[in-house]
A protein has these predicted regions:
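A residue-level marker of the well-folded mature domains of exported/periplasmic proteins
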Residues: 1-137
């Protein structure tokens, strides 16, 4: 997929083990090492929020380095509203479960199933936060 975006270069790829404090530690370490980066993409909102906290602690202005998380959970939505995260990606757990159950039923019946089942993701930008907040009420 990156071949479609030749201007993007991955300079670090590490796991913060889905934890906010470890996301903060990793980002702090990159900053202390002098690693230059323009964006952080974290595989969940917790790690993204930790990265944002590290940048804030280092004196970086909100939005100076774009941070995107995944999940669109309430803490992630709040971080987007506060300008700490540029966006989050909502993974629809209900649609994922529905597709999984449908595939299981087909397997039980001996019917063929697709090798991959695509459940669309939704990008949550600041202007869409209110819509996603309603889903949690």
């Amino acid at each position: 997929m990156l071949k479609d975006f030749p201007g993007i270069k991955i300079v670090e790829q590490q796991s913060a083990e889905w934890q906010r404090n470890k996301g903060m530690d990793l980002t702090s370490n990159w900053l202390l090492a002098g690693t230059q980066f323009d964006a952080i993409v974290a595989n969940n909102d917790e790690m993204a929020i930790g990265a944002a906290m590290a940048l804030q602690q280092a004196g970086k202005a909100k939005g100076e380095i774009a941070i995107v998380g995944i999940d669109g959970l309430p803490d992630g939505l709040a971080a987007i509203k506060r300008g700490l995260l540029a966006a989050s990606v909502f993974q629809d757990p209900k649609a994922q479960a529905t597709q999984a159950v449908q595939a299981a039923i087909k397997m039980i019946k001996g019917e063929p199933i697709e090798a991959q089942v695509w459940v669309p993701f939704e990008l949550i930008k600041p202007e869409q936060v209110a819509v996603f907040e309603q889903r949690y009420k």
